[in-house]
C-alpha cells in the first residue's frame, strides 16, 4: 500500500502526488489501482478550491532533510510562518538541519505537538544565538524531566547546560505531582 495526496497539497509536508506516482509506476510490477482520469479531474477541482488559500512554498516543496529533522507538516508550516513574519526565512535550512542534533541529544521524544514545537524552538535558538546558548523553555524542561521520561535518556551535557542556563534542577518526579 502506498499513501498519496493530490496536488496542490502534495509534496513537502504531505505525501507524493498520486498522478506522479501513478506515472512513475506504470509498467512496473506495482501499479496504483486508480482511475487516473478521475483522479486528474478531482485534482483540478481541488486545485481550484485551494486557489483562495495561501500555501507556503516550503509546504509544497520536497525537502529531503525533513525525515532527519523530524518536522511534521503542521509544525513546519506554523514555524516557517513565524520565520516569514519576522523576515528570517533565510535561516530555514539551518534550523531544519539543526533539528537532528536537538532530537538526538534531547532523548528522541515523539515529534508531535508540543514536542515538535520544542524541537524547532531549540533548533531555532541554536541557529540564532549559537549552539546551546539559550534554551527554549519547553525543550529545557523536557530534557530536565518536567514532562516525564523521554524514550532515551537526554545527553548528560545537555541536561547540565539546561539546568545551569534555566536555573532548574533535573527531576525524576511524576509530572502530575509537579504540575498539581
Predicted regions and their residues:
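Generic alpha-helix signal with a bias toward terminal, lower-confidence helices
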Residues: 11-14, 46, 58, 155, ...
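Short, surface-exposed, polar/charged, turn-prone segments marking secondary-structure boundaries
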Residues: 6-7, 29-33
